[in-house]
């Protein structure tokens, strides 16, 4: 694991976050397995309970592809594109051969795409979003009509950033239909 005081050091600082995950990439999957981190699997289960016919998914901040692995287990015909700022994480993801396209960039910047997705995922990375209020309109542009955006967020930051109010302010853009209890 990188020699950084905490994951919070990366919040709002893209270069620091990129460096943090580049340094951690080779041990990331093993570390999260040791933490018994189940958010990717639980998020996939929730996603497929909400929408069964997912063909295309965009995985924002895909990291080493843990969410993509769970998607493929659920539906091996799904087509996944991903983006991440960590070049080292993307190298690991590419070796797993799960994603059709991988983009090296921040999820806070719009990706130039020629198509829309049935679902967009952002699992374990909302922590690093500097301006979540600007992210939702970007996400909306990636989704097909009736598409699903699934994300996880830390409980402490959900409260601090008043995410309930933020989500409520986008009710006209999105249909919010599920809020789970905290996941690990």
Located regions from the model:
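N-terminal, positively charged/glycine-rich alpha-helical extensions of SAM-dependent methyltransferases
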Residues: 1-26
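Conserved alpha-helix/loop element of class I SAM-dependent methyltransferases that forms part
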Residues: 36-54
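Class I SAM-dependent methyltransferase SAM/SAH-binding core
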Residues: 58-110
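A short acidic, Gly/Pro-enriched loop at the edge of an enzyme's catalytic core
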Residues: 111-120
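A short SAM/SAH-binding and catalytic strip from SAM-dependent methyltransferases
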Residues: 119-132
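A short glycine-rich, Lys/Arg-flanked "PGG" loop and its adjoining helix->strand segment in the class I
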Residues: 133-145
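Conserved beta-strand signature within the Rossmann-like core of class I S-adenosyl-L-methionine
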Residues: 146-154
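Conserved Class I S-adenosyl-L-methionine
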Residues: 161-182
